[in-house]
Amino acid sequence: MATFEHTTVLLHEAIAALNVRPDGIYVDCTLGGGGHSREILQQLGLEGHLYSFDQDQTAIDYNQSNLATYLERGQVTFIKSNFANLKTELNARGLDHVDGVVYDLGVSSPQFDDAARGFSYQHDAPLDMRMDQSQKLTAQTVVNTWPYADLVRIFYRYGEEKFSKQVARLIERERAVQPIVTTGQLVEIIKNAIPARARRTGGHPAKRVFQAIRIAVNNELGVLETSLEQAIDLINVHGRVSVITFQSLEDRLVKTIFKEHSDLPELPPGLPVIPAEMQPDYRLVSRKPVVPSDAEIEANRRARSAKLRAIERLKITNK
């Protein structure tokens, strides 16, 4: 069985933002190493329940043992599914509303550290990058078959890579000679495509391209938008959705969705008092994102880009 040597980022802050009630029904959309699930379960009474999602069977298997005490008490249910299926999976279990939903986005440390999964530019491994090992699309397929224009688009849009065209052009040339099947091959191509001066700044030169391919393979932004809209609709009054992001694209998406739901509607000019029915159904738990402390960043470098945002439901309006 795989082990999860995983330090959960913003653990206490993310669960504090949920305002857990002992008898509440909660959802952890990203089970991973079980850090957030355990924190919620420790605050639940026997009448409360947690539903934990993960599309990675390795995470489910690990937590069968890791959270065995709570499983035996019947306090937690594991759901092997993409969190884009949040509403469908919960409805199938007789749930129309829950009291809180937490997301810890990005790839878990065990997935990064398992060279065979192909997520990391630090290890030579088959180009894979699938979070759900049963899906067909892999990084190898993207790199070897997607047209030049599509590669440029994902490198720029998902990786914010300034040298997207140069990297895509060299990939196109190299794959015509032989298939690109390992992370090591891809790293060398990226290094050769990016000018030497640019390689010396901004961290590892392959970081942005690897991020872009991972997002494309797993449709991360699409499934996040779908799932977040479902979570916001599912929470009860005073229920909350708490989200930890690790890169700017995800954070901007979360910020935008939360803003859309918590902003006042367009009001007639000169309206002296905003009537109750025009007040938003949701509010931001804090106006600015919560970020890790210096001490947490020093202890865990992967925490440095983390941001936490949360939203609370104030009322349910029949639309």
From Swiss-Prot:
Going by the UniProt record, its keywords in alphabetical order are:
Cytoplasm, Methyltransferase, rRNA processing, S-adenosyl-L-methionine, Transferase
Among the GO biological process terms of this entry, one is:
rRNA base methylation
Primary localisation category: cytoplasm
User: Which molecular function terms from Gene Ontology are attached?
Assistant: rRNA (cytosine-N4-)-methyltransferase activity
Q: What class of enzyme is it?
A: transferase
Compartments where found? Cytoplasm
Q: What is its EC number?
A: 2.1.1.199
Q: Which reaction does it catalyse?
A: cytidine(1402) in 16S rRNA + S-adenosyl-L-methionine = N(4)-methylcytidine(1402) in 16S rRNA + S-adenosyl-L-homocysteine + H(+)
What is one GO cellular-component annotation here?
cytoplasm
Pfam families assigned to the protein according to its UniProt record, in alphabetical order:
Methyltransf_5
Q: Where does S-adenosyl-L-methionine bind?
A: G34, G35, H36, D54, F83, D104, Q111
| InterPro entries assigned to the protein according to its UniProt record, in alphabetical order | RsmH (IPR002903), SAM-dep_MeTrfase_MraW_recog (IPR023397), SAM-dependent_MTases_sf (IPR029063)
NCBIfam families, per database record: 16S rRNA (cytosine(1402)-N(4))-methyltransferase RsmH (TIGR00006)
Function statement: Specifically methylates the N4 position of cytidine in position 1402 (C1402) of 16S rRNA.
The UniProt family comment states: Belongs to the methyltransferase superfamily. RsmH family.
This protein's name: Ribosomal RNA small subunit methyltransferase H
The gene designation is: rsmH
